[in-house]
Amino acid sequence: MTQITFKNNPIKLSGSEVNEGDIAPNFTVLDNSLNQITLDDYKNKKKLISVIPSIDTGVCDSQTRKFNEEASAEDGVVLTISVDLPFAQKRWCASSGLDNVITLSDHKDLSFGRNYGLVMDELRLLARSVFVLNENNKVVYKEIVSEGTNYPDFEAALKAYRNI
């Protein structure tokens, strides 16, 4: 079980750990229109999965913007996953000024968080993290940010994404 800190408080993450070299497990989340989405919906595309605790915080907002601005022109897809309600994600997307933002909600049953070992049970939030998957869903990059209020290593994640 991985342990991080969130606002300097120790938090254990629950769920199944996923590592570089693994085939990423499938998951079910909701899009902004309450449609069920799975990893299989992005078959044969490289993926940058940006995981945030909540879209309504400054760090999460910045992380979502940065990855979408830097990686959306690449031949692949950038997915931002949080436990925010789809309605909150839809509101954020409408006000963000960004095109092509894909936000997905793991609020319903934490399928993504549990399958990737990212659930902060005490807070019912997901740990800030980044996964890069190739077209065959092999994990080629993984970062779980050790302090949940800090930024991920944007450059390392983007380099891994671009090098697929």
Swiss-Prot record:
Superkingdom of the organism of origin: Bacteria
InterPro entries recorded: Redoxin, Thioredoxin-like_sf, Thioredoxin_domain, TPX, Tpx_CS, Tpx_Peroxidase_subfamily
Residues annotated as domain Thioredoxin: 18-163
Paired cysteines (S-S): 60-93
Active site positions, chain numbering: 60 (cysteine sulfenic acid (-soh) intermediate)
Keyword Transmembrane helix appears in the UniProt entry: no
This protein's UniProt keywords: Antioxidant, Disulfide bond, Oxidoreductase, Peroxidase, Redox-active center
Keyword NADP part of the UniProt annotation: no
Enzyme Commission number, as recorded: 1.11.1.24
Catalytic activities: a hydroperoxide + [thioredoxin]-dithiol = an alcohol + [thioredoxin]-disulfide + H2O
Single GO MF descriptor: thioredoxin peroxidase activity
Oligomeric form and interacting partners: Homodimer.
NCBIfam families (UniProt xref): PRK00522.1
Protein's job: Thiol-specific peroxidase that catalyzes the reduction of hydrogen peroxide and organic hydroperoxides to water and alcohols, respectively. Plays a role in cell protection against oxidative stress by detoxifying peroxides.
UniProt record similarity statement: Belongs to the peroxiredoxin family. Tpx subfamily.
Additional information: The active site is a conserved redox-active cysteine residue, the peroxidatic cysteine (C(P)), which makes the nucleophilic attack on the peroxide substrate. The peroxide oxidizes the C(P)-SH to cysteine sulfenic acid (C(P)-SOH), which then reacts with another cysteine residue, the resolving cysteine (C(R)), to form a disulfide bridge. The disulfide is subsequently reduced by an appropriate electron donor to complete the catalytic cycle. In this atypical 2-Cys peroxiredoxin, C(R) is present in the same subunit to form an intramolecular disulfide.
Name of this chain's protein: Thiol peroxidase
Taxonomic source organism: Staphylococcus epidermidis (strain ATCC 35984 / DSM 28319 / BCRC 17069 / CCUG 31568 / BM 3577 / RP62A)
Gene behind this protein: tpx
